[in-house]
Amino acid sequence: MDNSTEETFSMDTSEPLEEGEQTHEQRPHTRSNPEGAEDRGVVHQAGVGSRSEGEGEAAQVEDPLPTTTTVPTNSTPPPTLEFQLKTPRVNCPEKVIICLDLSEEMSTQKLESFNGSKANALNSSQKMIEMFVRTKHKIDKRHEFALVVANNEAMWLSGFTSDPREVCSCLYDLETNVCESFNLEGLFNLIQQRTEFPVTDNVQTIPPPYVVRIILIYSRPASQPALALTDNMKKMLQCPYFFFDVIYIHNGSEEEELCWKDIFGFFSSLDSKGTSYKYEVSITGPALELHNCMARLLAHPLQRPFQSHAAYSLLEEEEESPESEVTV
């Protein structure tokens, strides 16, 4: 992948600099700062990066390593050719809509925290969302973020902003509720009302001014009413500049294994283009797995490969283990 446009994957939790605190000292050209990318001023028009034919295409990766999620059910095969759209692999701005589930399951104290104590999924999700937003902002200050919370219905909590502090100010004063269902169609309708989708004359050659991405953090019991896909949702999902990433936090119990796998399979089936990422994490497992999933979502959706082709070890022959995964 072209290092001049590739986004980095390291989480950062530091506060963004205030106006007046910015320095003009040029950093050396390193892997984390290729060609002094972070030292260039912010421009209003997305940079157009030309790439040779087929460069960085996921379909040309040989012998890919498996993904490092809890079970291999999220390694979905690449989609059929009719949906394999080739879009410019550029680092254009993102409009990221983070949807946080507020069902009562998120308050269950079952996750194993870093110090060995028990934590709930809501607190862990709040921390990883803040780290994600701050890190994406450092990668490209043109990125914008919005926060949506989901009870029985989705509610727009924070409008699009490029200031991480505005998002984080709304993030922690949240409480879980008993929820009877999850209105996925309502979530898509809300996003369609609040977001304008980009359009270009040529999808394959002209970079979009921005892309739209939903990151859904979902934790509902498998006993709730089945999720459904409508025609309007299909149209949104087939847009080449729209991405729907999912982190599914399930109870991990063996007796309900088939049920939560069905839900995870439904989310996987929504990705007709093969460009979205889906992860499942057990609510009884380590919180590190949850943070690892969010760290992998730092990659720009136009630049990342199919999820089944993604590898996170430094060497091809190196076997991945929980200790070697991305930590935050």
Curated annotation (Swiss-Prot):
Which keywords does UniProt give here?
A: Cell cycle, Cell division, Chromatin regulator, Cytoplasm, DNA damage, DNA repair, Mitosis, Nucleus, Ubl conjugation pathway
Task: Point out the coiled-coil segments of this chain.
Answer: none
Query: What is its subcellular localisation?
Result: Cytoplasm; Nucleus
According to the lineage, what is the superkingdom?
Eukaryota
Gene Ontology biological-process entries:
cell division; DNA repair-dependent chromatin remodeling; double-strand break repair; mitotic G2 DNA damage checkpoint signaling; positive regulation of DNA repair; response to ionizing radiation
Biased composition of type Low complexity is found at 64-74
Ranges of biased composition (kind: Polar residues): 1-13
What broad class describes the main subcellular location of this protein?
A: cytoplasm
| Family that this chain belongs to | Belongs to the BABAM1 family.
Q: What the protein does?
A: Component of the BRCA1-A complex, a complex that specifically recognizes 'Lys-63'-linked ubiquitinated histones H2A and H2AX at DNA lesions sites, leading to target the BRCA1-BARD1 heterodimer to sites of DNA damage at double-strand breaks (DSBs). The BRCA1-A complex also possesses deubiquitinase activity that specifically removes 'Lys-63'-linked ubiquitin on histones H2A and H2AX. In the BRCA1-A complex, it is required for the complex integrity and its localization at DSBs.
Q: How does it assemble?
A: Component of the ARISC complex, at least composed of uimc1/rap80, abraxas1, brcc3/brcc36, BABAM2 and babam1/nba1. Component of the BRCA1-A complex, at least composed of brca1, bard1, uimc1/rap80, abraxas1, brcc3/brcc36, BABAM2 and babam1/nba1. In the BRCA1-A complex, interacts directly with abraxas1 and BABAM2. Component of the BRISC complex, at least composed of abraxas2, brcc3/brcc36, babam2 and babam1/nba1.
Q: What is this protein called?
A: BRISC and BRCA1-A complex member 1
The record lists the organism as Xenopus laevis (African clawed frog)
What lineage is this protein's organism placed in? Eukaryota, Metazoa, Chordata, Craniata, Vertebrata
